């Protein structure tokens, strides 16, 4: 995914890549095969959907992996502090995010703010994904594609109405 801002043109961009690896517990050193130069600069952030703090105004008990239990899969709640090393099945979602904001004097602050925002966004999204398991588990590929098409249609409609403001997946 590549995001740009029309006003800032080439002075602002966010690029992110994602790779899901079944059976991985986060041990792959370079899952997305980035260059040695980028490896030296990267900052690895581990997201723990059960134990990472989220802003209190975003907290919903029904989206808390420490409280959620899937009726369909039997997964959850994630109450063991070491759940990441014990649960089965397991998958790691490796994400690589490049943030570039070229504006003298505030570049570092804006990039740092955006990195924290992206971390919060990914944490909230993956908490929701886990806690909504019973809504999507067992869907066929055709049902998923239909849901994607409906979501795209709804987003396009909102985009045509004006600015999209979303704090979580339910807002979209």
Locate predicted features.
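Eukaryotic helix-grip
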Residues: 1-172
